[in-house]
Structure formats: structure tokens, C-alpha cells
């Protein structure tokens, strides 16, 4: 392992309003950007690009996607003009083989799961980035293995950033007033934290089998916000430190847990 190996991050992105707000979560992301080694490029996996098959942004100047509605105009006026990297996109095609990866040269860009956190980490938007989609047709263990395939990039000064929420149930969210976590949400969030460093066969991994937890299906009625975590755990070497820079549950059922591997 390189002494300058880049960390791998899972960031609980939460509401798009975090882009405009100053709170414990946004300050934690900013602190990571200030204290972690500066990468030469970033590969980001966001819950908001959930596709059939795997794609990677491959344009020179990806657009900022405002994939949300009903928020203040200031949010739609905010852009994150980080450069793309067609060369890095091609590198992912080769690295992830035999998994077929489509080079997306115009359709996607950076959605709020990616730019919404990176605008706090690297507000200058001057680090080349590509975004990798999450294949909705694959089981959890497959995504863990994808993280393993990406791990070698960390020795090339490339940071892996995954963005989601390990508890994400908007149907039960308390949008106004009471903010106390639901017991099942707190239980599942604790279950995730307790199993971050689990080692053993993939098919037995508690976080691959997250729906077996009594609060798993309530915490994640759909998979897209949970799966990004598995990419980061797949990139762990089994020895390096795993730390939690910030944690919390907002609106009763939205976990803001963030995880850093290797810093």
C-alpha cells in the first residue's frame, strides 16, 4: 500500500438544502476537504444516478444537475463547474472489465448527490471528476466487488467518494417540527456502524444482507441510497482505519452518517 494512498469516503448527503446551509454535516465535509490529502482526481458514486447497466461521465465539462424540486431559487442558481476527465472515464472502462461500462458523453453530469457534498469539500471546483452510475439490476454483493475493483485507484492519487444515506425513508420523514429518530432508524444506523469493519465471505456480510435487519426495509424502502456505502467498504483493505467524521439522523428517518476509510 502506498504511504500516500487516498482515502475512500461515504458521505450522507441528505437534503439539497445542505448546499446553502452551515451545519454540523457541511462543516464536517469542509473539514475533510481541508485536512485530507488533495487528490489529483475524484471518482464519485451517487445514489442519484441509478441505472440499468453501468455508466460513467466522459465529457470534458459535465453539467450541474439540479435533480430536485420545490427548493429556493438560490439552489438552482448554484453550479459546480468541476472539470470532467474523459481519460479517467476510459480508465474505469478498463479497470472494471469485464463489466461493460458505457461512456456517457452528454446525458448525465454531476447530480446533487455528488456536487452537493463536493461543493463543501472542494468549493473551488478545480479537481477533475467522473461520476459512476449504480447498476440497479445487481445484488448488493456485486456492488461490494465493484468497490474492490476501484480500490487500486487510491494508489494513483484518486479519491473515491460515495454519496447516499444509510437510512433513507422520505415517506416517514418528519418534515416539520419533531425531529426525534424513529427507533427502527436509530437501530439500523447503529447496525451499520457496528458492521463497518466486518470481515468474512461476502454472502455473509451483514451489510450485504442489510435487509435481514428488522429495520432494514423500513430504513431503505429502495436500495439506491444504501448501496454507495458498499463501494467504499469494498475499497477497504481490511487493515486501515475506518472512522466516522459525523453522524446523526434528521427528520426521523434520514441518516447523515459519513464514513472515511483510510485516513
Regions found by a protein language model. Give the residues of each.
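A short aromatic-anchored loop/beta-hairpin motif
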Residues: 2-103
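Solvent-exposed alpha-helices and their adjacent loops that cap or buttress functional pockets
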Residues: 2, 35-36, 121-125, 152
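Internal, conserved structured core segments that host functional sites
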Residues: 89-144, 149
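Flexible, glycine/proline-enriched loop segments at strand-loop-helix junctions
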Residues: 75-83, 105, 133-140, 216
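Short, basic/glycine-rich phosphate-binding loops at helix/coil junctions
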Residues: 9-10, 67-72, 122-130, 207-208
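Conserved beta-strand elements of the Class I
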Residues: 9, 41-43, 128-130, 159-161
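Short, well-ordered beta-to-alpha junction loops that form the rim of enzyme active sites
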Residues: 46-48, 108, 158, 163-166
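Surface-exposed, charge/polar-rich loops and edge strands
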Residues: 94, 98, 127-128, 136-138, ...
